[in-house]
């Protein structure tokens, strides 16, 4: 064990500069594409500071989109005593989820949202105009080199056009309406190289289905992906949008493609269409009276292409994955899991009968997808006993498909049309899977119960495979597909290289003068005894049982009594003992409290806020893990619970205290929660150091992410709601 003295300059190994262990950033350090885009939208940074993966930053995004959930966001916004939007041009409302629902209740909700948009001058797209993500792209809100967020998990979609898109929660959306900004921890960044060229009949959908199936061990969980490689230029923009869209299912929080000449040509086509359509139909406030479209215009495109945002040579990535596109054949995802991907030829014998087929969603229902399905079904009929549902990604898409004759081709084949919107993809409206049925869909999720009955089976595939299956009644490829001409590989060629290994011992000096001062009122140190839960994927239900979730009158004290009940029934009592025995703080700048340690993906599962507040109410001000579930992270920091990632510390704790030296088996002492006697932890908020004192003589210091200024702002104001009120 080595103690690190307090010196003016510290020497640390290069591995400590990983996404979770960076001490500081110099101006000369190369940045990734994601880091560069975030740099443009980060506010409140000290002069000369370059953002890095792992940093907590305050972001002022270009736009924030909400859909049917705009209603609850309005309620949250008004509950904060907000009367006006910080910037009416920033939000975009697009009603797209429950568009088939003509009930009085739903129509009243939609009218309320429209009235709010009109009152505040927000761009509003009514039900039937299309899926929000498609609108954000085709109306130019998402733009190369920009950052756009939405209160929907498929915001990754915008990465298909070189725009950093990521999901936020509803409270964040209300905060952006009020203040123009939200906090974000820049995730670890993974490079995915797509090499070679797809064979005829293989599509972008096959690429992402294969990636999610091949790399199914959480290689990109909660990461931001940057796509590179020689194969990118051969992918159409629609294919890139499909791939970026489904990086969500792969586990990533963003997936961004580079800006290239193919994207420029695509946008030139979009601009021509916008001009032909007079761009202001339907009218939205941002275009009223404009002679030139405020987003879709040649000058803006020229600027984006001339000043392309690209990664610096030598930029650091947490891992590098690669897939040889030339070795890929059509793939099918499922049943009922995106982590299971099978080459289409392997599913042909014995045949798998289907009951329903779907060409809907923001993933694969653009004009090129509809054309692909129409080519397969031209002159054919949907098989007897099969229902084939189609819905365009937007009304603009449907107009294009109708003009090309493709929409009518599908109708003539027996397809049943639905309005432009989400529909069956999210289990709303007509045509859902019934008990015992099998469906194949060009959508993005096939989780059990997602598209109907939990007793149904769902597969995902490309539009051509979906259409061919609808015509034949079994899962199959188009008749034009010659299997003998496809790449003859048992599986595609792929690889993974992890960077930042602990074996790299290049010393890096850290200058104390580069450290940013902490906000007044934020603790310089967190210090106290530790509790170790040696468990990966500890769910929010384990932290706070569902049976308490809707007890709205439950007190903070009661939350503390049931915290971690489903994981360890003795946890609450253990935490209480530590809380009552806390010594006096070693200095006025130190916040005393027990500190919880656990494994990876801590807080996976449902979005219940009480999982975070129960831990905080149990006297635990800070949690240290290998990684956190993204929504849990947002809920925690929004409620003043500090989270720190330190994989090296968790590794040592696991080896020393977990049964058999691995997590998920409890502790060596037979307990689910380990409390090492006499051990204490001290977290240095400013430097990103975690010092573990193992008694009077021994201690060891670990690198961790520093507590960023954005998190400090929320904490000193008592959480997100207090921060918003203080900002008004």
Swiss-Prot record:
It is an enzyme of class 4 (lyase). It catalyses: (2R,3S)-homoisocitrate = cis-homoaconitate + H2O. Its cofactor is [4Fe-4S] cluster. [4Fe-4S] cluster binds at residues 362, 422, 425. It holds the Pfam family Aconitase. The keyword Metal-binding applies. Its main location: mitochondrion. Binds 1 [4Fe-4S] cluster per subunit. GO terms for biological process: lysine biosynthetic process via aminoadipic acid. Keywords: Amino-acid biosynthesis, Iron, Iron-sulfur, Lyase, Lysine biosynthesis, Metal-binding, Mitochondrion, Transit peptide. GO terms for molecular function: 4 iron, 4 sulfur cluster binding; homoaconitate hydratase activity; metal ion binding. Residues 1-24 form a transit peptide. InterPro entries: Acnase/IPM_dHydase_lsu_aba_1/3, Acoase/IPM_deHydtase_lsu_aba, Aconitase/3IPM_dehydase_swvl, Aconitase_4Fe-4S_BS, Aconitase_4Fe-4S_dom, AconitaseA/IPMdHydase_ssu_swvl, Homoaconitase_mito, IPM_dehydratase_rel_enz. SUPFAM superfamilies: Aconitase iron-sulfur domain (SSF53732), LeuD/IlvD-like (SSF52016). Pathway: Amino-acid biosynthesis; L-lysine biosynthesis via AAA pathway; L-alpha-aminoadipate from 2-oxoglutarate: step 3/5. GO terms for cellular component: mitochondrial matrix. It comes from the Eukaryota. Catalyzes the reversible hydration of cis-homoaconitate to (2R,3S)-homoisocitrate, a step in the alpha-aminoadipate pathway for lysine biosynthesis. This is Homoaconitase, mitochondrial. It comes from Cryptococcus neoformans var. neoformans serotype D (strain B-3501A).
């Amino acid at each position: 064990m080595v103690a690190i003295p307090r010196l003016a300059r510290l020497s640390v190994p290069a591995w400590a500069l990983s996404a979770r262990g960076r001490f500081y950033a110099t101006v000369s350090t190369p940045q990734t594409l994601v880091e560069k885009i975030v740099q443009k939208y980060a506010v409140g940074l000290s002069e000369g500071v370059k953002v890095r993966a792992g940093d907590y930053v305050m972001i002022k995004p270009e736009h924030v989109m909400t859909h049917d959930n705009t209603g609850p966001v309005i309620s949250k916004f008004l509950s904060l005593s907000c009367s006006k939007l910080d910037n009416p041009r920033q939000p975009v409302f697009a009603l797209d989820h429950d568009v088939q629902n003509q009930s009085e209740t739903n129509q009243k909700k939609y009218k309320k949202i429209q009235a709010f948009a009109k009152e505040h001058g927000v761009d509003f797209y009514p039900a039937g105009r299309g899926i929000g993500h498609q609108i954000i792209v085709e109306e130019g809100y998402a733009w190369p080199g920009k950052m756009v967020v939405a209160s929907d998990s498929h915001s990754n979609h915008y990465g298909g056009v070189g725009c950093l898109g990521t999901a936020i929660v509803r409270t964040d959306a209300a905060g952006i309406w009020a203040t123009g900004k939200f906090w974000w921890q820049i995730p670890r960044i993974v490079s995915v190289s797509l090499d070679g060229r797809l064979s005829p009949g293989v599509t972008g959908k096959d690429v992402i289905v294969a990636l999610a199936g091949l790399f199914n061990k959480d290689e990109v969980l909660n990461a931001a992906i940057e796509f590179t490689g020689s194969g990118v230029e051969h992918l159409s923009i629609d294919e890139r949008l499909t791939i970026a869209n489904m990086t969500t299912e792969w586990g990533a929080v963003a997936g961004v493609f580079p800006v290239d000449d193919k994207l420029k040509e695509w946008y030139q086509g979009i601009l021509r269409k916008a001009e032909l359509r007079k761009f202001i139909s339907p009218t939205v406030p941002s275009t009223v009276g404009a002679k030139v479209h405020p987003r879709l215009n040649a000058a803006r495109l020229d600027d984006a292409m001339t000043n392309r945002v690209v990664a610096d040579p030598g930029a650091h990535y947490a891992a590098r994955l690669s897939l040889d596109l030339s070795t890929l054949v059509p793939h099918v995802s499922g049943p009922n899991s995106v982590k299971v991907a099978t080459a289409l030829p392997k599913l042909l014998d014995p045949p798998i009968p289907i009951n329903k087929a779907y060409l809907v969603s923001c993933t694969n229902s653009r004009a090129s997808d509809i054309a692909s399905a129409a080519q397969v079904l031209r002159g054919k009929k949907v098989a007897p006993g099969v229902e084939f549902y189609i819905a365009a990604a937007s009304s603009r898409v449907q107009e294009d498909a109708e003009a090309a004759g493709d929409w009518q081709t599908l109708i003539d084949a027996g397809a049943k049309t639905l309005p432009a919107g989400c529909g069956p993809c999210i289990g709303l409206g007509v045509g859902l899977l019934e008990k015992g049925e099998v469906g194949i869909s060009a959508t993005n999720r096939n989780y059990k119960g997602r598209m109907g009955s939990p007793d149904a089976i769902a597969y995902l595939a490309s539009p051509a495979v979906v259409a061919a299956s609808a015509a034949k009644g079994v899962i199959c490829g188009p008749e034009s597909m010659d299997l003998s001409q496809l790449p003859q590989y048992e599986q595609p060629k792929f690889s993974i290289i992890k960077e930042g290994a602990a074996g790299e011992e290049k010393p890096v000096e850290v200058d104390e003068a580069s450290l940013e001062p902490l906000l007044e009122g934020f603790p310089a140190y967190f210090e106290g005894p530790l509790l170790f839960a040696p468990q990966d994927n500890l769910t929010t239900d384990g932290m706070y049982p569902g049976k308490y979730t809707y007890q709205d009158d439950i007190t903070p004290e009661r939350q503390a009594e049931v915290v971690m009940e489903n994981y360890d029934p003795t946890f609450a009592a253990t935490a209480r003992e530590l809380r009552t025995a806390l010594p006096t703080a070693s200095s006025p700048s130190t916040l005393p409290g027990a500190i919880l340690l656990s494994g990876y993906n801590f807080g996976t599962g449902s979005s219940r806020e009480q999982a975070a507040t129960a831990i905080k109410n149990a006297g635990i001000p800070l949690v240290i893990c290998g990684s956190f579930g993204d929504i849990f992270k947002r809920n925690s920091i929004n409620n003043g619970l500090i989270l720190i990632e330190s994989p090296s510390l968790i590794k040592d704790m696991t080896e020393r205290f977990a049964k058999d030296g691995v997590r998920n088996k409890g502790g060596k002492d037979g307990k689910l929660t380990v409390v090492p006697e006499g051990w204490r932890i001290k977290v240095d908020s400013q430097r990103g150091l975690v010092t573990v004192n193992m008694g009077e003589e021994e201690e060891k210091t670990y690198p961790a992410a520093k507590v960023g200024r954005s998190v400090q702002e929320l904490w000193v104001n008592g959480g997100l709601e207090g921060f918003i009120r203080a900002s008004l």
